[in-house]
Structures are given as C-alpha cells and as structure tokens.
From Swiss-Prot:
This is Small ribosomal subunit protein uS7cz/uS7cy. Keywords: Chloroplast, Plastid, Ribonucleoprotein, Ribosomal protein, RNA-binding, rRNA-binding. Belongs to the universal ribosomal protein uS7 family. Its main location: plastid. One of the primary rRNA binding proteins, it binds directly to 16S rRNA where it nucleates assembly of the head domain of the 30S subunit. Gene3D superfamilies: Ribosomal protein S7 domain (1.10.455.10). GO terms for molecular function: rRNA binding; structural constituent of ribosome. It comes from Acorus calamus var. americanus.
C-alpha cells in the first residue's frame, strides 16, 4: 500500500466572460500548441454565432447540447481467458461531460465549413436539437453497451 496520500480532485475554473465552467472545459479541450487566447477566441465566436442563429442564451444551448451528448454507459475492453470482451460500464457525470465535449469537438472538426467557430456553433446547435454527429456517436456507444450486456458481470 502506498504511503502517499491521494491527490485532491481539481475543480474546473470558470472562464472570464461567461463565468461558466463548461466554457472553460471546452476551451481547454480545443486548445492546441498552448495557444489559449486563440482557443478563447474560437469559443467566444462560436457562442456569438449561436446567439445570432437561435436568438437564445448561448450558454443554455451549450448546456443542452452537452446534456444531450453525455453518455450514461460505455464499453471497456476486458481480457478474460484468452478472449477480449467489451464490458459495459457506467460513467460518472464528470467523465461523461468530458467525453461529450471530446465528441462534440471531434464532430465539429469533421464538419465542412469556413472556420472552427462556425463548425462548432453548427454542431452545438444540432446537438441541442438532438441531431448531429456527436449525438450519433452517443447512440452508437449505447448500442454497443446494450449488445454486450451479457458481459456486464465481468466488471
């Protein structure tokens, strides 16, 4: 047993303009090569575009999109007696949000379009409405977990 104590879990800080933790999580995931100011610009432009498109609060659209994409269950590879099984496991809220943000950004990057702010805003609006690539990814994950329900006891 280790003598060192367990590390305290860091709470996500909120961003300077919207004072929201989700926005900051999104900024930290979109960040490339340490260019945080560029990441903030992209996110704020995307939120402004959402405001123009939907004429509603962009934070509520963001929350709704992330809530819609957040998975409840996922599959994890587990080796049992020479064969690898996809074992369904429940996901906590923090890990679920992190996965949702990752899927939203991946779907945004895949989209055709002018710039990342435009693509991200389109993906967030679609996800809030219940369509889009990120929602499809969540449904795919849930189907995989449902198909491998028989291996749930391998946890």
């Amino acid at each position: 047993m280790s003598r060192r104590g367990t590390a305290e879990e860091k709470t996500a800080k909120s961003d300077p303009i919207y004072r929201n933790r989700l926005v900051n999580m999104l900024v930290n995931r979109i960040l490339k090569h340490g260019k945080k100011s560029l990441a903030y610009q992209i996110i704020y432009r995307a939120l402004k575009k959402i405001q123009q498109k939907t004429e509603t609060n962009p934070l509520s659209v963001l929350r709704q999109a992330i809530r819609g994409v957040t998975p409840d269950i996922a599959v994890k590879s587990r080796r049992v007696g020479g064969s690898t099984h996809q074992v369904p496991i429940e996901i906590g809220s923090t890990q679920g949000k992190a996965l949702a943000i990752r899927w939203l950004l991946a779907a945004s990057r895949k989209r055709p379009g002018r710039n990342m702010a435009f693509k991200l805003s389109s993906e967030l609006v679609d996800a809030a409405k219940g369509s889009g690539d990120a929602i499809r990814k969540k449904e795919e994950t849930h189907k995989m977990a449902e198909a491998n329900r028989a291996f749930a006891h391998f946890r």
